[in-house]
């Protein structure tokens, strides 16, 4: 009897919610003319059915093939636009910028990033400009990236030691875990002065948060429904994660209030934020929550994107042995006899750098760059309404035959023939974004990919675990904001002897 009553209540609640949403849609004003084209919509859900069972970047690429590079998709209540060409992307990110410079808000980002009081997900504002300026000038300048060289060398040396131990025991290595630990340790020491307690747990929390922050939760699609927001099954999980994250970040903040200096004998980035917090000249007060959000940004942007790219590089090299052989030959010839390599040393590794570029073309760290319209604007002749969600399909543009010869083939040599970079000037190739919201940690992140990668290629030969063939490798992506591999990468290292 109790079960029947509970079922009846659930049915009534769902029916009531659906009725309200239908009434709201009926009352909507007549659509504006000259909106982007899109597929036929279903009542209430719009185009949500097109995403079911698929990764969003794949599903939206199919929409663009049929309806063009500026396409409208209705995600529940949310008017959304997918941009899939370099021309449309350039307009949105450069020509009409800052009209499209906001981030759209999701339940995941709002909870985990302290009401979006950070840099990554903050709306375009005085606060965002102030925090970004501090970030770039105090932590992520090219000069500072080079000054962190000894940290990279120390942490890579630690990684090589673990790999040699595993090789001596004949064991396969979970490279996913090892690379995550490496990037986390580098970022902790560079940004916070030392490797923090609970850093491994924080990395896992970041990974979970990013998987739930893409804006594709049901409550994100129907923001006006208080009931759906209340019933959102991931919301309670997010709040549990937020409480644990807050405890870890609060400990970091309190520890910095007590300590005298970081690893360099001077200020680290948190010390800088504390100093700026007391500065009467700053335009927007820096709250403790903003500092915590910044720390969480540093972990989410730094650890996840660098490790994701490094792992995809290694996966593609294992899948393409001839590319692996060519990259190793270059690294071993150029760096033979050298010790303590860092950023300047890897600049001469042209082929390895092309391998990294090719990896980011096929596996961008952020497959769909999220933006939001701050005001009505025009892109490619179409009207984009105020508050529209914009999704720039970086994954799709990286595989578009209009821009790339043999787009589904891993072919680093293509960059010998065509001059393209990822600094935000070639809009068909923007793994770090473009415009005023281009990733401020581009140089730092790239150094944390290229320097460890050169060491992995120089010091070890690699084979797949359990006798697997390259053609058997699973190259699937996981769901979420970042384009991480779905499965961990297990490899068997064999130390390389330069004298042999």
From Swiss-Prot:
Record's bilayer topology term: Single-pass type II membrane protein
GO MF annotation list: (S)-limonene 3-monooxygenase activity; heme binding; iron ion binding
GO cellular component, one term: endoplasmic reticulum membrane
Location in or out of the cell: Endoplasmic reticulum membrane
Residue ranges of the TM segments: 3-23
Documented EC number(s): 1.14.14.99
Protein keywords: Endoplasmic reticulum, Heme, Iron, Membrane, Metal-binding, Monooxygenase, Oxidoreductase, Signal-anchor, Transmembrane, Transmembrane helix
Cofactor(s) the protein requires to work: heme
Reaction catalyzed: (4S)-limonene + reduced [NADPH--hemoprotein reductase] + O2 = (1S,6R)-isopiperitenol + oxidized [NADPH--hemoprotein reductase] + H2O + H(+)
Disulfide links within the chain: none
Binding-site list for heme: 439
Family: Belongs to the cytochrome P450 family.
Function summary: Hydroxylates (-)-(4S)-limonene to (-)-trans-isopiperitenol, a precursor of (-)-menthol, responsible for the cooling sensation of peppermint.
Protein name per UniProt: Cytochrome P450 71D13
Naturally occurring in which organism (per UniProt): Mentha piperita (Peppermint)
């Amino acid at each position: 009897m109790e079960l029947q009553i509970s079922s009846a209540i659930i049915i009534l609640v769902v029916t009531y919610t659906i009725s309200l949403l239908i009434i709201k849609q009926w009352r909507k004003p007549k659509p504006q003319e000259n909106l982007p084209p899109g597929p036929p919509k279903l009542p209430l859900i719009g185009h949500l059915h097109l995403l079911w069972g698929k990764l969003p970047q794949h599903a939206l690429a199919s929409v663009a093939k049929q309806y063009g590079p500026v396409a409208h998709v209705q995600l529940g209540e949310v008017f959304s636009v997918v941009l899939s060409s370099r021309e449309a992307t350039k307009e949105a990110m450069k020509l009409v910028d800052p009209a499209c410079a906001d981030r759209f808000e999701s339940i995941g980002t709002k909870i985990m990033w302290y009401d979006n009081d950070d840099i990554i997900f903050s709306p375009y504002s005085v606060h965002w400009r102030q925090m970004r300026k501090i970030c770039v000038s105090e932590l992520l300048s090219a000069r500072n990236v080079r000054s962190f060289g000894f940290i990279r060398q120390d942490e890579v040396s630690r990684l090589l030691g673990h790999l040699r131990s595993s090789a001596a025991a004949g064991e396969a290595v979970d490279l996913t875990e090892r690379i995550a630990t490496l990037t986390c340790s580098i970022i902790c020491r560079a940004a916070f002065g030392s490797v923090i307690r609970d850093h491994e747990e924080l990395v896992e929390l970041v990974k979970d948060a990013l998987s739930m922050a893409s804006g594709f939760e049901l409550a994100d699609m129907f923001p006006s429904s208080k009931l759906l927001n209340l019933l959102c099954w991931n919301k309670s999980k997010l709040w549990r994660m937020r409480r644990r994250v807050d405890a870890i970040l609060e400990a970091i903040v309190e520890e910095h209030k007590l300590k005298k200096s970081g690893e360099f004998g001077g200020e680290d980035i948190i010390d800088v934020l504390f100093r700026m917090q007391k500065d009467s000249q700053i335009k927007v007060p820096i709250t403790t929550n903003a500092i915590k959000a910044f720390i969480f940004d540093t972990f989410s942007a730094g650890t996840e994107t660098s490790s994701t790219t490094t792992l995809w590089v290694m996966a593609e090299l294992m899948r393409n042995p001839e590319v692996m052989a060519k990259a190793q030959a270059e690294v071993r010839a150029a760096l033979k006899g050298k010790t303590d390599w860092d950023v300047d040393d890897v600049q001469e590794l042209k082929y390895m750098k092309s391998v990294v570029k090719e990896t980011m073309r096929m596996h961008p760290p952020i497959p769909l760059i999220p933006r939001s319209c701050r005001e009505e604007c025009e892109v490619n002749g179409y009207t984009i309404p105020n508050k529209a969600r914009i999704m720039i399909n970086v994954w799709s543009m990286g595989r578009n035959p209009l821009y790339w010869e043999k787009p589904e083939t891993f072919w680093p040599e293509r960059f010998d023939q065509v001059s393209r970079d990822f600094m935000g000037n070639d809009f068909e190739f923007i793994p770090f974004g473009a415009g005023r919201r281009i990733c401020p940690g581009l140089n730092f992140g790239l150094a944390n990919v290229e320097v460890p990668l050169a060491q992995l290629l120089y010091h070890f030969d690699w084979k797949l675990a359990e006798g697997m063939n390259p053609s058997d490798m699973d190259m699937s992506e996981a769901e979420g904001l970042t384009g991480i591999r779905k499965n961990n990468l297990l490899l068997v290292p064999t130390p390389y002897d330069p004298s042999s």
